[in-house]
From Swiss-Prot:
It comes from Nostoc punctiforme (strain ATCC 29133 / PCC 73102). Belongs to the class I-like SAM-binding methyltransferase superfamily. rRNA adenine N(6)-methyltransferase family. RsmA subfamily. The lineage of its organism: Bacteria, Bacillati, Cyanobacteriota, Cyanophyceae, Nostocales. It catalyses: adenosine(1518)/adenosine(1519) in 16S rRNA + 4 S-adenosyl-L-methionine = N(6)-dimethyladenosine(1518)/N(6)-dimethyladenosine(1519) in 16S rRNA + 4 S-adenosyl-L-homocysteine + 4 H(+). This is Ribosomal RNA small subunit methyltransferase A. PROSITE patterns: RRNA_A_DIMETH, SAM_RNA_A_N6_MT. Its EC number is 2.1.1.182. Specifically dimethylates two adjacent adenosines (A1518 and A1519) in the loop of a conserved hairpin near the 3'-end of 16S rRNA in the 30S particle. May play a critical role in biogenesis of 30S subunits.
């Protein structure tokens, strides 16, 4: 048995209950995009406990693993499975479309199902969804991830809650986020110091595009930079307080509101109005 390596933040999932929840959330079925079944991308398959559960349910599964020892183990155990493709490398730097050119039997994945390393959760989600300025032009149907519970709470947080922050806005601008279940630390070997949670992201068409996505990013950084302060104080470096207060009233936003009190759509509308007022409209996204 290969021991988990700290350098890759490895923790082996051992809970059948958690595996069942992940499989159910993935909703592996035939669809218009994949009439023969789903094509799954798994990031960090580890010893393959989730991989083995998924393979009989899908058309194909592409696993990306950075650990060479685990790649050897998976190749030995699953290498002859026709619908399984293993790629050794760092997912964050991997150009998956270029790799798949050499494997015509494996089409572009339409879903992601993964127990990802918690220390690179943010970069992984950004690569899967894109950013406010550059959304993924070919979004996945769904993304099911096992992440740190604290991060999950920020992903699906609602306006007005203490956990609603810039990450909440960035992710919810691009996708609907749903909490599937929580997973205790005891479900892993070795047990991490934190509990975990399964979340499902469904990329969506952006309802109100940001006129200047980069400016929206700037407003989010400023707005959430000091969460205890009122928004009009945090944004006074880019717009006069009185002018901002008037604009907030026009948008039916409480002038005394803090950053976490404003919904995703309100953030976009506010940024768009400020962009128009300052003459800094850019090119919107999809």
């Amino acid at each position: 048995m290969i021991r988990p390596r700290k350098v890759f933040a490895q923790h082996w999932l051992k809970s059948e209950k958690a595996l069942d929840a992940i499989i159910k959330a993935a909703e592996c079925t035939e669809s218009d995009r994949s009439p023969k079944g789903d094509c799954i991308l798994e990031i960090g398959p580890g010893t393959g406990i989730l991989t083995r559960r998924l393979l009989p349910l899908v058309q194909s599964l592409i696993a990306v693993e950075i650990d060479r020892d685990l790649c050897q183990l998976l190749s030995k155990q699953l290498g002859k499975t026709e619908n399984f493709l293993l790629l050794q490398g760092d997912f964050l730097t991997l150009d998956l479309p270029s790799y798949l050119v050499a494997f015509p039997n494996f089409q572009k994945p339409n879903k992601v199902v993964a127990n990802i390393p918690y220390n690179i959760t943010g970069p992984i989600i950004e690569k899967l969804l894109g950013t406010i300025a550059n959304p993924n032009p070919e979004p996945f149907d769904s993304i099911v991830l096992l992440v740190q519970k604290e991060v999950a709470e920020r992903l699906y947080a609602k306006p007005g809650s203490k956990t609603f922050g810039a990450l909440s806005v960035r992710v919810q601008y691009l996708a609907e986020c749903e909490l599937i279940c929580t997973v205790p630390a005891s479900a892993f070997h070795p047990a991490p110091k934190v509990d975990s949670a399964v979340v499902r992201l469904r990329p969506r068409k952006i309802e109100i595009p940001a006129l200047n996505p980069r400016q929206l990013e700037t407003f989010l950084k400023l707005g959430f930079g000091a969460k205890r302060k009122m928004l009009r104080n945090n944004l006074q470096s880019v717009i006069e307080r009185d002018r901002l207060s008037h604009l907030l009233e026009q948008l039916k936003i409480n002038p005394q509101a803090r950053a976490e009190d404003i919904s995703v759509q309100q953030w976009v509308i506010l940024a768009n109005e400020l962009a128009v007022a300052s003459g800094e409209q850019g090119v919107g996204n999809r």
